[in-house]
């Protein structure tokens, strides 16, 4: 791949009771970009950085993220910072991989493709990390490393039981795809959520995060 077009989308929220104006800046690898942002009192919005306005987002010769066994799961350092009056209001540092995922259902069979190559998901279900919910970064790091050492390429986050960032960070690092369930055991035959609003909020949070 000689070029990848990035389109960062960042959710920002003004927790103050008055409008604010600031600058949202981002960095992915060596690429930097920024734009002014206006927020009404208590407003939440999605700020989009589009390559038509920021041509530097057309990354040349990107190092791609590949699943375990298909190549190196390369990750870029990323940062997003929001400034008010030239002072940092909030910022987030994380790592991000560049990859393209596609699928089709030819002959009623689900086929997955990563960066144009056919991908075979091999792995198993993960429910709770363990019964006392004591897993943190070190434990997830070890468990997912074992997953990769067994030549697995995917795990299913069964019924969305795990929401820890450390799990997703470890999967990014070791090239493990995540089949993310929503918070339902059997959507076709129930039971339906007792609290639909909570369920929808949980689903939106997962979509925004991963």
What are the roles of these predicted feature ranges?
Residues 140, 164, 199, 203:
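Aromatic/hydrophobic pocket-lining residues that form the small-molecule binding cavity
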Residues 144-196:
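Aromatic-lined substrate-binding rim segments of carbohydrate-active enzymes
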Residues 1-154, 158, 162, 173:
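Secreted/periplasmic carbohydrate-active enzymes, especially glycoside hydrolases
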Residues 196-210:
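An active-site-proximal structural segment forming one wall of the substrate-binding cleft
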Residues 84, 175-178, 210:
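A generic secondary-structure signal for well-formed alpha-helical elements
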Residues 130-133, 184, 208:
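Conserved helix-loop functional segments at active or binding sites
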